[in-house]
Curated annotation (Swiss-Prot):
GO terms for cellular component: plasma membrane. The keyword Membrane applies. Residues 51-58, 122-140, 221-237, 294-312 are cytoplasmic. It comes from the Eukaryota. PROSITE patterns: G_PROTEIN_RECEP_F1_1, G_PROTEIN_RECEP_F1_2. The gene is OR2J2. The keyword Transit peptide does not apply. It is found in: Cell membrane. Glycans are attached at residue 6. This is Olfactory receptor 2J2. It comes from Homo sapiens. Keywords: Cell membrane, Disulfide bond, G-protein coupled receptor, Glycoprotein, Membrane, Olfaction, Receptor, Sensory transduction, Transducer, Transmembrane, Transmembrane helix. Pfam families: 7tm_4 (PF13853). The lineage of its organism: Eukaryota, Metazoa, Chordata, Craniata, Vertebrata. It is a multi-pass membrane protein. GO terms for molecular function: G protein-coupled receptor activity; olfactory receptor activity.
């Protein structure tokens, strides 16, 4: 049977997920649920703090709250479906559901790539052009940059996901993944998918390599500025904020590069599942910890919110 772009609403896919390791499904369910709850709690905590505490009404925390919201949405677009599949025999997803999931996973992933570039630019201006920071990072401009990240992500995803579902999928409907994503869907095709694979490589290069190059360029300039600093306190502050952002960048870009910067035909399905599991489950849960563990401003805001700060 052939599934085309005009498939009926009764069509469905079977998400194989981790069914090759049935003995691990219970363990995976518990571990993934814990990480998912950590993601929800940590990122909601940052969003609430950034909104209610006036001390955090700065460009850095505005972008951080946007990143937290992106992480929440990105994780929620795939993990609840995975948890349901791990705990029950029903592992299907409707054709429409698969389209929607693919669209949001791509959109939110691309938006996060762009937003991480914006955050690195914010740090560059703060360190390299501190006297012009309030002018260059005006609240209106910050809102425009954040909105641009979302618009770019959702626009490019609409084009790319449409191109993916135009490919005729035939035979079985077994998606060897735990969510609908491009390489896994292309493996179901009964036609030559080299054009789609090339498109995926080009899109990945544009929205993975170019943002990464821009981020590294910004931090190269920051490193030169830091080396010329005389103040030890200033050095420590820069290393704390920039080091946290670089760690988040590494946790996001390294697995994404391993996942998308090679043709789907050369990518091991099992390897791809665990790489995807890392950047959809582990990374979003660690980001709040990375940004807050040694951050005095966030700790102070948390104390004020919880009423733990005494007058001085």
């Amino acid at each position: 049977m052939m599934i085309k772009k005009n498939a009926s609403s009764e069509d469905f896919f079977i998400l194989l997920g981790f069914s090759n390791w049935p003995q691990l499904e219970v363990v995976l369910f518990v571990v993934i649920l814990i990480f998912y709850l950590m993601t929800l709690t940590g990122n909601l905590f940052i969003i609430i703090l950034s909104y209610v505490d006036s001390h955090l009404h700065t460009p850095m925390y505005f972008f951080l709250s946007n990143l937290s919201f992106l992480d929440l949405c990105h994780t929620t677009s795939s993990i609840p479906q995975l948890l349901v599949n791990l705990r029950g025999p029903e592992k299907t997803i409707s054709y429409a559901g698969c389209m929607v999931q693919l669209y949001f996973v791509l959109a939110l992933g691309i938006a996060e790539c762009v937003l991480l570039v914006v955050m690195s630019y914010d740090r560059y201006v703060a360190v390299c052009r501190p006297l012009h920071y309030t002018v260059l990072m005006h609240p209106r401009f910050c809102h425009l940059l954040a909105a641009a990240s979302w618009v770019i992500g959702f626009t490019i995803s609409a084009l790319h996901s449409s191109f993916t579902f135009w490919v005729p999928l035939c035979g079985h409907r077994l998606v060897d993944h735990f969510f609908c994503e491009v390489p896994a869907l292309l493996r179901l095709s009964c036609v030559d998918t080299h054009a789609n694979e090339l498109t995926l490589m080009v899109m990945s290069s544009i929205f993975v390599l170019i943002p990464l190059i821009l981020i590294l360029t910004a931090y190269g300039a920051i490193a030169r500025a830091v080396l010329s600093m005389q103040s030890t306190t200033g050095l420590q502050k820069v290393f704390r904020t920039c080091g946290a952002h670089l760690m988040v960048v590494s946790l996001f870009f390294i697995p994404v590069m391993c996942m998308y910067l090679q043709p789907p035909s050369e990518n091991s399905p099992d390897q791809g599942k665990f790489i995807a599991l890392f950047y959809t489950v582990v990374t979003p849960s660690l980001n709040p910890l990375i940004y807050t563990l040694r951050n005095k401003h966030v700790k102070g805001a948390a104390k004020r919110l919880l009423g733990w700060e005494w007058g001085k």
